[in-house]
Structures are given as C-alpha cells and as structure tokens.
C-alpha cells in the first residue's frame, strides 16, 4: 500500500482491489464512548445523504481494531486550478450539503481532489448537521481559510453553511495563485478585517456574515462553460457574483481608485 498522507489521528493509503485502485482512510477511534457515538452518527448520516457528483464517493466503511476505515474513490491532489472551476464544482458540492443541513467546516485546498475532469470535496471528519456554535468550534477551519466570525469567536454565536462559502473563496484564490490571500497570525487578520470594514472592502470580501453569498446564491449567478472539448473562458453571468469574483481577480474599486492585494498589506 502506498501512503497518500498521514496526520496525528490517522492516515490515507492507496489500496488495490482487482484492477482498480482506491483510497483507504484510517482514523484512530476516540477514547471516550460518547465521542465514538458522535463519530458513528456523523458517518451514518453522511452515508445516507451525501451522494453527489462533486462529493467523493465512499464505497464502504468498517471498524478494524481501534481504527475506523473508509474506502473511497481515488482522486489526485489539486495544487493549481482555475478559481472559477473550483467555485463551480465545489460550490455545487456545498450547495448539496447545505440543502441537506450539513456544514463541511473544513473547506481548504487539501480537501479537494480531482477525479477525471471533476473537482470533488473530501474529508468530512468535521462535518456537522444543523447550525453550530463558535464556543464548540475552536480551530475547525484552517487559519488561512477561516471566516471572520470564527476568527473572532466572541461568546456563543451560531453559524451555518456560509462559513463554508468564505473558506471556498479563499481556497479558490489559493489554488489559482499558490499563495493565501490572507496570511499570518489571527490578530493580524482581524486587524485587516476591521481596518477595511469602514472603507467598503469588507463588503467586497463578503466578510459580513449576513450579507455573504449562500451556496445557492453563488450558483444562481455563476455560469461555467461545458468542459468537454473546451478549455476557453469560463464566463460569469452578470449580477452580484461580480462583487464576489472581483475579490478573486486581483483588484477592487475602493474610494474611486484601484488597489491590489500588495497595496492592502503595505497599508497595514
């Protein structure tokens, strides 16, 4: 078996059955019974509900010693991709999940793979159903891809699938340019969010939780050309998605002047 990745709580390897290859994810089971039941409840719900062309296909799951194993289709890691294709494919996956009541809570480049011509969402270990509380969330979403409400996390605040949408935007930017839009420690990020909120950039970055696109709104305003036999432009329809897309394309109309990402960092 060839190793694909390894972390503190498990690993992913490539296995072969007949002439086909699959990815086998092994997770070390939690020590306490109440945590184990939460894991099992999550797995049962996902297996019943999360079947979609842009969600990685799971073939079987089982217990083995102190590990929980999931066998799924094998995809290729994504290191560079057209941001519009990521918005379209993973946006569809998130819309499907959100319509079923699930929040992924860990959208980032490492959790997207390519299977054939499709991009697919993987790793549902942090997925939960219904709204969640910031008190219980902690560092669920990786820092570079975390929305402001989880960076601040003041008090007990409920959140829904819109946290995934902010993470999706930053993920798409990263995969297009191989660098994060916002890097650094949490206090630096919060300083930038607060500095630009009053100047209008906050809205263009869709940081305001109430004003942010839902996955449904993104797909309603976003049109991607068919991929068969064409590698040309992937056009957006006109509409509010232009504001969303402008954040990803490298410039903003801010106080009647053009300001790029480098300019943002220079002014901090």
Predicted feature residues:
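Short beta-strand micro-motifs within the conserved protein kinase catalytic domain, predominantly
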Residues: 57-66
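Conserved short submotifs of the Hanks-type protein kinase catalytic core
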Residues: 65-78
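Activation segment signature within eukaryotic-like protein kinase domains
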Residues: 86-87
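Catalytic-loop of the protein kinase fold
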Residues: 98-114
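Activation segment/activation loop of eukaryotic-type protein kinase catalytic domains
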Residues: 115-143
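Conserved end of the kinase activation segment
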Residues: 149-162
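C-terminal lobe of the eukaryotic/viral protein kinase catalytic domain
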Residues: 179-210
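Regulatory extensions flanking the kinase catalytic core
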Residues: 213-253
């Amino acid at each position: 078996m060839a190793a694909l990745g390894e972390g503190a709580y498990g690993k992913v390897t490539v296995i072969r059955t007949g002439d086909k290859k699959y990815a086998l994810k092994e997770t070390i089971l939690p020590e306490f019974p109440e945590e184990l039941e939460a894991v099992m409840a999550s797995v049962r719900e996902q297996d019943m509900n999360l079947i979609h062309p842009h969600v990685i296909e799971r073939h079987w799951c089982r217990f083995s010693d102190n590990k929980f194993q999931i066998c799924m289709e094998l995809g290729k890691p994504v290191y560079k991709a057209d941001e519009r294709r990521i918005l379209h494919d993973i946006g569809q996956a998130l819309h499907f999940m959100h319509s079923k009541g699930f929040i992924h809570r860990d959208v980032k480049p490492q959790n997207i793979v390519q299977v054939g011509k499709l991009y697919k969402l993987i790793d549902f270990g942090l997925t939960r159903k219904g709204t969640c509380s910031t008190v219980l969330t902690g560092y669920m979403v990786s820092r570079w891809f975390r929305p402001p409400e989880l960076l601040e996390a003041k008090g007990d605040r409920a959140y829904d699938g819109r946290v995934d949408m902010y993470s999706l935007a930053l993920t798409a930017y990263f995969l297009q340019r191989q660098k994060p839009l916002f890097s650094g420690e949490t206090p630096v990020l919060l300083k930038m969010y607060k500095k630009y909120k009053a100047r209008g950039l906050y809205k263009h970055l869709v940081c305001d939780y109430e004003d942010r696109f839902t996955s449904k709104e993104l797909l309603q305003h976003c049109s991607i050309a068919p991929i068969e036999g064409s590698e040309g432009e992937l056009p957006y329809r006109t509409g509010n998605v232009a504001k969303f897309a402008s954040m990803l394309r490298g410039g903003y109309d801010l106080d009647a002047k053009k300001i790029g990402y480098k300019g943002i960092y220079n002014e901090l």
